[in-house]
Every structure is written in C-alpha cells, then in structure tokens.
Amino acid sequence: KSCCPSTTARNIYNTCRLTGTSRPTCASLSGCKIISGSTCBSGWBH
C-alpha cells in the first residue's frame, strides 16, 4: 500500500505507476511511501 502526504503527490505517484515504473521508484519521485500494513500514518492519508 502506498501513502502520500497530499493529493498532488498521489497524482504524481499514480501517473508514474501508469507508465509501468516500480512502486519504490514512484514513491521516491512523488514523496509518497510504501507501507507493509493497511493503514497509513496520520497526515499520509492520500
């Protein structure tokens, strides 16, 4: 699961993923983070 700090970051992440880029790379580019659980930390709910 990916957690992003803003809607903008989420959009960047989603667009990046559409091009077939890996999750870790897209998370790094967009400022999002990948978590192993199912609930994002407070403030990372986008």
From Swiss-Prot:
Protein's recorded name: Ligatoxin-A
Family: Belongs to the plant thionin (TC 1.C.44) family.
Gene3D superfamilies recorded: Thionin-like
Subcellular location per the Swiss-Prot or TrEMBL entry: Secreted
Disulfide pairings: C3-C40, C4-C32, C16-C26
Gene Ontology annotations of biological process type: defense response
InterPro entries found in the cross-reference section: Thionin, Thionin-like_sf
Gene Ontology molecular function, alphabetical: toxin activity
Taxon lineage: Eukaryota, Viridiplantae, Streptophyta, Embryophyta, Tracheophyta
UniProt xrefs under PANTHER family: THIONIN-2.1-RELATED
GO terms under cellular component: extracellular region
Alphabetical keyword list: Disulfide bond, Plant defense, Secreted, Toxin
Function: Thionins are small plant proteins which are toxic to animal cells. They seem to exert their toxic effect at the level of the cell membrane. Their precise function is not known.
